[in-house]
Amino acid sequence: MVKYILKRLGLLLLTLFLIVTLTFFMMQVMPGTPFSNPKLTPDQLEILKHAYGLDKPLWQQYFIYVGHMFTGNFGTSFIYTNQPVITMIAQRLPVSMQLGTQALILGTVLGALMGKASARRKNGLLDGIFGFLSVLGISVPSFVIGTLILLYLGFNLNLFPISGWGTFSQTIMPTIALSFAPMAVVTRFVRSEMIESLSSDYILLARAKGLSEKEVVNKHALRNSLIPMLTLIGPMAAGLLTGSVLIEKIFSIPGIGAQFVDSIPAKDFPVIMATTIVYAVILMVFILVTDILTAIVDPRVRL
């Protein structure tokens, strides 16, 4: 098991290295410059480039950046003068993590309940409704769902605050919007697993022993369907990471996703680089946890 974990960890570290390298050099070929103020004189522009180390050869900039990265130094923002990037991320990351956690919990719980109900009423009306919601959650981007929720629940019905962060009511609409994707994935997975479980021999044996239908479904079929669901952590985390970027912008949430969107047109390379790395590390942690849980549930994957 230890050998398997070390192997997976090594592959993830290699992937992270490639992401850092590709992102760094992609930043260099992006058109434009963060110092595009027409009021800057050539001398002032040279001073700024020297201050941020942009006058050094590209290969030297790369090795300096990688060396600083391992010490947690992501440089300072080009736009927010003298503001360390690591400080900016530390202030906003908890907001994004809270939003993602709430959406993951809500989506998982609702998905498990909907999948259970769909399996028990296979091909029925409820199964059709939940199936439609699952297709909606998988096929429609979260920012489209978020926009519709904002227009209907926020502007038309005025049920919740339309923007900001700080109170529980402000988290409701973005959490619902972001939870659609994990809800859809879990619903389809639990439905499929439970339909298979309900027709298995051990379920027939449980019914033959006189157990109530509630006990058969909850203690046997549902429980055995939820164990393999641990393998979905990685894909759902990826969906939440990519979906939260625009959701934060739509609902004016002060998370790293909104900061990332703002930094792109501003050509704030240190913020873009650091945010990309943070997203990659978070995703890789989820993938590693998923791989470990999968290896525990199914030892064959270690081979």
UniProtKB/Swiss-Prot annotation:
Gene3D superfamilies attached to this UniProt entry: MetI-like
Compartments, as annotated in UniProt: Cell membrane
Assembly, per entry: The complex is composed of two ATP-binding proteins (DppD and DppF), two transmembrane proteins (DppB and DppC) and a solute-binding protein (DppA).
Subcellular location, principal: membrane
Disulfide bond positions: none
GO biological process: peptide transport; protein transport; transmembrane transport
Keywords, sorted A to Z: Cell membrane, Membrane, Peptide transport, Protein transport, Transmembrane, Transmembrane helix, Transport
Name under which the protein is recorded: Dipeptide transport system permease protein DppB
Domain of life per record: Bacteria
Organism in which the protein naturally occurs: Lactococcus lactis subsp. cremoris (strain MG1363)
Segments passing through the bilayer: 9-29, 62-82, 93-113, 129-149, 166-186, 227-247, 269-289
Record note on disruption phenotype: Inactivation of the gene impairs growth on low concentrations of di-valine.
Family classification: Belongs to the binding-protein-dependent transport system permease family. OppBC subfamily.
CC annotations in GO: plasma membrane
Function: Part of the ABC transporter DppABCDF involved in dipeptide transport. Responsible for the translocation of the substrate across the membrane.
Record-linked InterPro entries: BPD_transp_1_N, MetI-like, MetI-like_sf
Membrane topology, as annotated: Multi-pass membrane protein
Annotated ranges, domain ABC transmembrane type-1: 93-290
Gene: dppB
